[in-house]
Protein backbone atom coordinates (compact mmCIF):
# COMPACT_ATOMS: atom_id res chain seq x y z
CA UNK A 1 0.00 0.00 0.00
CA UNK A 2 2.76 2.39 0.97
CA UNK A 3 4.76 1.46 -2.12
CA UNK A 4 1.72 2.14 -4.32
CA UNK A 5 1.15 5.53 -2.68
CA UNK A 6 4.82 6.48 -3.10
CA UNK A 7 4.67 5.46 -6.76
CA UNK A 8 1.61 7.68 -7.33
CA UNK A 9 3.32 10.64 -5.63
CA UNK A 10 6.49 10.09 -7.69
CA UNK A 11 4.56 9.95 -10.97
CA UNK A 12 2.61 13.11 -10.07
CA UNK A 13 5.84 14.90 -9.20
CA UNK A 14 7.45 13.92 -12.48
CA UNK A 15 4.39 15.14 -14.40
CA UNK A 16 4.54 18.47 -12.58
CA UNK A 17 8.23 18.90 -13.33
CA UNK A 18 7.68 18.03 -17.00
CA UNK A 19 4.81 20.51 -17.26
CA UNK A 20 6.87 23.26 -15.61
CA UNK A 21 9.76 22.61 -17.98
CA UNK A 22 7.40 22.80 -20.95
CA UNK A 23 6.05 26.13 -19.69
CA UNK A 24 9.57 27.51 -19.25
CA UNK A 25 10.51 26.36 -22.76
CA UNK A 26 7.34 27.97 -24.13
CA UNK A 27 8.17 31.28 -22.42
CA UNK A 28 11.75 31.15 -23.72
CA UNK A 29 10.53 30.45 -27.25
CA UNK A 30 8.02 33.30 -26.99
CA UNK A 31 10.69 35.69 -25.75
CA UNK A 32 12.84 34.85 -28.74
CA UNK A 33 10.15 35.78 -31.24
CA UNK A 34 10.89 38.81 -33.45
CA UNK A 35 8.65 41.84 -33.18
CA UNK A 36 6.60 41.03 -36.27
CA UNK A 37 5.64 37.65 -34.79
CA UNK A 38 4.76 39.06 -31.37
CA UNK A 39 1.16 39.93 -30.49
CA UNK A 40 0.55 43.10 -28.51
CA UNK A 41 -2.40 44.27 -26.47
CA UNK A 42 -4.48 46.98 -28.09
CA UNK A 43 -3.53 50.31 -26.56
CA UNK A 44 -5.99 53.15 -25.86
CA UNK A 45 -6.40 55.65 -28.67
CA UNK A 46 -4.62 58.47 -26.85
CA UNK A 47 -1.58 56.36 -25.95
CA UNK A 48 1.72 56.48 -27.89
CA UNK A 49 1.14 59.87 -29.52
CA UNK A 50 4.17 62.03 -30.22
CA UNK A 51 5.27 65.39 -31.60
CA UNK A 52 8.65 66.09 -33.15
CA UNK A 53 10.64 69.11 -34.28
CA UNK A 54 13.60 68.84 -36.65
CA UNK A 55 15.90 71.45 -38.12
CA UNK A 56 18.55 71.17 -40.80
CA UNK A 57 19.25 71.93 -44.43
CA UNK A 58 17.91 70.88 -47.81
CA UNK A 59 19.11 71.03 -51.40
CA UNK A 60 16.87 71.63 -54.41
CA UNK A 61 17.37 69.53 -57.56
CA UNK A 62 15.85 70.93 -60.75
CA UNK A 63 16.75 72.40 -64.14
CA UNK A 64 20.21 73.98 -64.12
CA UNK A 65 20.90 73.03 -60.47
CA UNK A 66 23.91 71.01 -61.60
CA UNK A 67 25.32 74.15 -63.21
CA UNK A 68 25.35 76.00 -59.88
CA UNK A 69 27.63 75.55 -56.91
CA UNK A 70 26.15 72.97 -54.55
CA UNK A 71 26.41 75.31 -51.55
CA UNK A 72 24.12 77.76 -53.38
CA UNK A 73 21.35 75.15 -53.61
CA UNK A 74 21.24 74.65 -49.82
CA UNK A 75 18.62 76.36 -47.66
CA UNK A 76 17.32 76.10 -44.07
CA UNK A 77 14.84 73.28 -43.46
CA UNK A 78 12.44 73.21 -40.46
CA UNK A 79 10.04 70.27 -40.01
CA UNK A 80 7.24 69.66 -37.48
CA UNK A 81 5.27 66.42 -37.10
CA UNK A 82 2.60 64.75 -34.99
CA UNK A 83 1.95 61.02 -35.05
CA UNK A 84 1.04 57.81 -33.27
CA UNK A 85 2.72 54.43 -32.91
CA UNK A 86 0.23 51.57 -33.24
CA UNK A 87 2.69 48.94 -32.05
CA UNK A 88 6.47 48.98 -31.41
CA UNK A 89 7.37 48.71 -35.08
CA UNK A 90 4.87 50.74 -37.09
CA UNK A 91 3.10 54.07 -36.91
CA UNK A 92 1.79 57.05 -38.87
CA UNK A 93 2.72 60.72 -38.77
CA UNK A 94 1.55 63.97 -40.31
CA UNK A 95 4.55 66.16 -41.13
CA UNK A 96 4.72 69.72 -42.38
CA UNK A 97 7.46 72.16 -43.24
CA UNK A 98 8.48 75.00 -45.46
CA UNK A 99 11.08 77.58 -46.23
CA UNK A 100 12.92 78.68 -49.33
CA UNK A 101 14.10 76.97 -52.50
CA UNK A 102 17.03 78.08 -54.61
CA UNK A 103 16.45 77.44 -58.31
CA UNK A 104 18.57 78.67 -61.21
CA UNK A 105 18.19 79.97 -64.73
CA UNK A 106 20.23 78.63 -67.67
CA UNK A 107 23.96 78.27 -66.90
CA UNK A 108 23.15 79.34 -63.31
CA UNK A 109 23.10 82.92 -64.56
CA UNK A 110 20.79 84.01 -61.77
CA UNK A 111 19.29 82.43 -58.66
CA UNK A 112 15.54 82.13 -58.04
CA UNK A 113 14.59 82.50 -54.36
CA UNK A 114 11.16 80.90 -53.83
CA UNK A 115 9.13 80.21 -50.69
CA UNK A 116 7.12 77.01 -50.29
CA UNK A 117 5.13 74.92 -47.82
CA UNK A 118 4.46 71.19 -47.79
CA UNK A 119 2.55 68.58 -45.81
CA UNK A 120 2.66 64.80 -46.02
CA UNK A 121 1.46 61.69 -44.22
CA UNK A 122 4.06 58.95 -43.70
CA UNK A 123 3.99 55.27 -42.84
CA UNK A 124 6.88 54.57 -40.44
CA UNK A 125 8.45 51.15 -39.84
CA UNK A 126 11.02 50.42 -37.13
CA UNK A 127 13.38 47.84 -38.63
CA UNK A 128 15.09 46.76 -35.40
CA UNK A 129 11.81 46.48 -33.50
CA UNK A 130 10.38 44.55 -36.47
CA UNK A 131 13.12 41.95 -36.89
CA UNK A 132 14.65 41.74 -33.40
CA UNK A 133 13.12 40.28 -30.24
CA UNK A 134 10.75 42.80 -28.66
CA UNK A 135 12.49 44.76 -25.94
CA UNK A 136 10.57 47.61 -24.23
CA UNK A 137 13.89 49.05 -23.03
CA UNK A 138 15.50 49.19 -26.49
CA UNK A 139 17.32 52.49 -26.99
CA UNK A 140 18.03 52.58 -30.73
CA UNK A 141 16.03 51.97 -33.88
CA UNK A 142 16.27 52.58 -37.63
CA UNK A 143 12.99 53.82 -39.12
CA UNK A 144 12.39 54.00 -42.89
CA UNK A 145 9.31 55.99 -43.89
CA UNK A 146 7.29 56.55 -47.04
CA UNK A 147 4.30 58.73 -47.79
CA UNK A 148 2.42 61.14 -50.00
CA UNK A 149 1.35 64.73 -49.62
CA UNK A 150 1.13 68.12 -51.22
CA UNK A 151 3.23 71.21 -51.80
CA UNK A 152 2.31 74.82 -52.53
CA UNK A 153 4.23 77.82 -53.84
CA UNK A 154 2.39 81.04 -54.64
CA UNK A 155 -0.46 79.91 -56.92
CA UNK A 156 1.11 76.54 -57.78
CA UNK A 157 0.27 73.25 -56.09
CA UNK A 158 1.66 69.77 -56.60
CA UNK A 159 1.16 66.21 -55.40
CA UNK A 160 4.32 64.93 -53.69
CA UNK A 161 5.96 61.59 -53.00
CA UNK A 162 7.96 61.56 -49.81
CA UNK A 163 10.41 59.09 -48.26
CA UNK A 164 13.54 58.69 -46.20
CA UNK A 165 15.11 57.08 -43.17
CA UNK A 166 15.40 58.08 -39.53
CA UNK A 167 17.83 56.99 -36.81
CA UNK A 168 16.43 57.54 -33.33
CA UNK A 169 17.79 57.12 -29.81
CA UNK A 170 15.63 56.87 -26.69
CA UNK A 171 16.85 59.43 -24.14
CA UNK A 172 14.03 58.88 -21.63
CA UNK A 173 10.43 57.69 -21.47
CA UNK A 174 9.31 61.02 -22.92
CA UNK A 175 12.13 62.05 -25.27
CA UNK A 176 13.95 60.64 -28.32
CA UNK A 177 16.76 62.26 -30.27
CA UNK A 178 16.76 61.65 -34.01
CA UNK A 179 18.61 62.28 -37.25
CA UNK A 180 16.60 62.10 -40.45
CA UNK A 181 17.37 62.05 -44.16
CA UNK A 182 14.40 62.64 -46.43
CA UNK A 183 13.60 63.28 -50.04
CA UNK A 184 10.58 64.61 -51.91
CA UNK A 185 9.56 64.53 -55.57
CA UNK A 186 7.07 67.02 -57.01
CA UNK A 187 5.80 68.43 -60.30
CA UNK A 188 8.17 70.30 -62.59
CA UNK A 189 5.72 73.23 -62.92
CA UNK A 190 6.41 74.27 -59.31
CA UNK A 191 9.61 76.08 -60.29
CA UNK A 192 11.30 76.41 -63.70
CA UNK A 193 9.54 74.27 -66.33
CA UNK A 194 11.65 72.24 -68.73
CA UNK A 195 14.32 69.57 -68.61
CA UNK A 196 13.38 67.16 -65.81
CA UNK A 197 9.78 65.87 -65.74
CA UNK A 198 9.90 66.25 -61.94
CA UNK A 199 11.90 68.26 -59.45
CA UNK A 200 13.27 67.03 -56.14
CA UNK A 201 14.23 68.14 -52.69
CA UNK A 202 16.64 66.33 -50.36
CA UNK A 203 17.25 67.24 -46.74
CA UNK A 204 19.17 66.25 -43.62
CA UNK A 205 17.79 67.27 -40.22
CA UNK A 206 18.25 66.56 -36.52
CA UNK A 207 15.76 67.05 -33.73
CA UNK A 208 13.81 65.68 -30.78
CA UNK A 209 10.58 63.74 -30.38
CA UNK A 210 8.32 64.14 -27.35
CA UNK A 211 5.97 61.29 -26.37
CA UNK A 212 2.85 62.07 -24.39
CA UNK A 213 1.84 60.05 -21.34
CA UNK A 214 1.09 56.42 -22.11
CA UNK A 215 4.13 55.42 -24.15
CA UNK A 216 4.86 51.70 -24.49
CA UNK A 217 3.22 48.37 -25.32
CA UNK A 218 2.42 45.12 -23.53
CA UNK A 219 2.67 41.71 -25.14
CA UNK A 220 -0.66 39.91 -25.41
CA UNK A 221 -1.01 36.71 -23.35
CA UNK A 222 -1.46 33.52 -25.34
Where are these regions (language model features)?
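Cleavable N-terminal export/targeting peptides
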Residues: 1-44, 214-222
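Short glycine/proline- and aromatic-enriched beta-strand/turn motifs that initiate or cap beta-hairpins
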Residues: 20-83
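Short loop/turn motifs that connect adjacent beta-strands in outer-membrane beta-barrel proteins
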Residues: 38-48, 89, 128-141, 171-174, ...
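Residues that define the transmembrane beta-barrel architecture of outer-membrane proteins
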Residues: 47, 70-78, 115-119, 138-140, ...
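Residue-level detector of the transmembrane beta-barrel scaffold of outer-membrane proteins
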Residues: 50-52, 91-93, 141-145, 176-178, ...
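Residues on the lipid-exposed face of transmembrane beta-strands in outer-membrane beta-barrel proteins
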Residues: 53-57, 80-84, 121-127, 146-150, ...
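Gram-negative (and chloroplast) outer-membrane scaffold detector with strong preference
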Residues: 88-161
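Predominantly the C-terminal beta-signal and adjacent terminal strand-loop region
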Residues: 101, 105-109, 170-222
Amino acid sequence: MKKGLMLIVLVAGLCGITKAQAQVEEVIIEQRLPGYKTSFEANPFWHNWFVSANFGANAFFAEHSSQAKFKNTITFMPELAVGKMFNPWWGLRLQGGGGALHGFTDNAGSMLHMHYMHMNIDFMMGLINFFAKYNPDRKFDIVPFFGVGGMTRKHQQSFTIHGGIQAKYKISERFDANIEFQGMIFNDKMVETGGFPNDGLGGLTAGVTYYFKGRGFRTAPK
